[in-house]
Amino acid sequence: LGYAEPGNPKLDLNGFDAFAKIRILSALSFNIKISKSKCIMEGIENIKLEDIKIANQLGLRIKLLGISEIINNQLFETVHPCLVSKNSYIGNVNGVMNAVITEGKPVGQSILQGEGAGPGPTSSSLLSDLLSILRGNIKPPFGISYNKRKSIKPFNNQNYSNSLYLRFEVKDKQGVLSLITNRLSKFKISVKRIIQTPDKKNKKATIVIISHKTTEKNIKNCLCLLYTSDAADDVNG
């Protein structure tokens, strides 16, 4: 989703800029009013160099994505870092470039990509708006009057299913891995992949777990338990 603002990068780093974009795109895509409901929003402030290195080893890249879809006639929106394949289209959108991927029936998948910042794109957008005003062909921001757009119920975020990435910094001792997996199973989170890297010098180990899909509710409850447990010195997920 492009560069962070040099003066105040907070809105870019905490995901709010992407959040604003996905709300506008949802309104355009689904012909709805801009949602005022809460959505899952997580930025990239907590991602560490270690996470980037691990993703690279797995053939993956970390990308901050805004996702919107209609589930059972309800609107689901989320913004959070995702692990994507290095070989995927979205995995190769870098630098100042932005990309929007749409999927529908029967049209399938469409991709739009372009620069999201810089003097060229910014001045082009401003000039386009000014010319529209001068020509007198101003249209409503969403094509039709906002009041004519329909409202839609929000999807319960806690019921959304997704995979989970966890990285633990633990004491290298017997039973720690078993303790962590037991906590995961308590919330019906099944493990898809485990990587354990020992640090013999400091008598510690790094454990990386990627789960199968599970609900946001299970993920949230499990993380709350892991953050407060003595199973790990540091938890990132």
PLM features: what roles do these ranges have?
Residues 109-159:
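C-terminal, non-catalytic macromolecule-binding modules
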Residues 180-184, 221-227:
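Short amphipathic alpha-helices in soluble, non-transmembrane regions
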Residues 158-170:
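Short glycine-/aliphatic-rich beta-strand segments at the starts of folded cytosolic domains
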Residues 1-92, 97-99:
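Substrate-binding/catalytic subdomain of NAD(P)-dependent oxidoreductase enzymes
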Residues 187-206:
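Cytosolic Rossmann-like ligand/nucleotide-binding regulatory domains
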Residues 230-237:
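Single conserved hydrophobic/aromatic residue that forms the stacking wall/gate
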Residues 13-21, 46-50, 97, 117, ...:
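Conserved active-site and cofactor/substrate-binding residues in soluble primary-metabolism enzymes
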Residues 139, 143, 173-192:
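Short amphipathic alpha-helix segments
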